[in-house]
């Protein structure tokens, strides 16, 4: 089920996060699958990545996992397709490739790296999909404030900030994907 294309979901590998974020992740996956999108993710069983993978299976969606060989022990067993890379940099590129949107769920430093990298590529005209940070429970408000600071300091133009969508509900994410 990826008739509308694929979206990449960036998310946490941590098991220690508040479960409300995992529930929010499930809602985003259900919304994307119901609209006919295939999912691309980090492809592991760890943390929210595993939650995303489980929800794609429950929804009957298609799921491509992208991971470097050194993470093979964490491979989610029920992926439709696995893309192996040598490095984390290659992983990020392979995850984005051919997607129509990139959604960052609340996550850690890896998620932030993926989100900012994708936003940078969008600014440079090298990523044409939508860049979405799911601002569930205000999670990305500090990032928004930092980016606004960059704009006010003249380090970044407002056009870059305008490329970043910050929906607060799964319904708002779905509206951006329609």
Labelled PLM ranges:
Residues 43-105, 110:
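Acidic/glycine-enriched connector segments
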Residues 47-51, 139-148:
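Glycine-rich, charge-decorated loop segments at or immediately adjacent to ligand/cofactor-binding or catalytic sites
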Residues 50-56, 114-124:
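Short Gly/Thr/Asp-enriched flexible loops that form oxyanion-binding sites at enzyme active sites
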Residues 67, 105, 121-144, 158-160:
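Short, acidic/small-residue loops that bind anionic groups at enzyme active sites
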Residues 101, 152-178:
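A charged, well-structured terminal subsegment
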């Amino acid at each position: 089920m990826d008739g509308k294309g694929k979206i990449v979901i960036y998310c946490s590998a941590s098991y220690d996060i508040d479960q409300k974020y995992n529930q929010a992740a499930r809602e985003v996956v259900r919304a994307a699958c119901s609209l006919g999108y295939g999912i691309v993710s980090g492809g592991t069983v760890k943390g929210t990545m595993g939650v995303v993978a489980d929800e794609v299976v429950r929804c009957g969606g298609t799921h491509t996992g992208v991971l470097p060989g050194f993470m093979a022990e964490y491979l989610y067993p029920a992926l439709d397709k696995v893309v192996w890379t040598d490095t984390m940099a290659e992983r990020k590129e392979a995850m984005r490739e051919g997607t129509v949107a990139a959604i960052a769920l609340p996550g850690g430093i890896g998620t932030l790296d993926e989100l900012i990298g994708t936003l940078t590529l969008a600014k440079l005209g090298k990523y044409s999909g939508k860049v979405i940070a799911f601002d569930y429970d205000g999670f990305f408000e500090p990032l928004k404030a930092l980016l606004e600071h960059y704009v006010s300091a003249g380090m970044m133009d407002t056009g870059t900030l305008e490329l970043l969508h910050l929906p607060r509900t799964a319904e708002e994410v779905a509206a951006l994907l329609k």
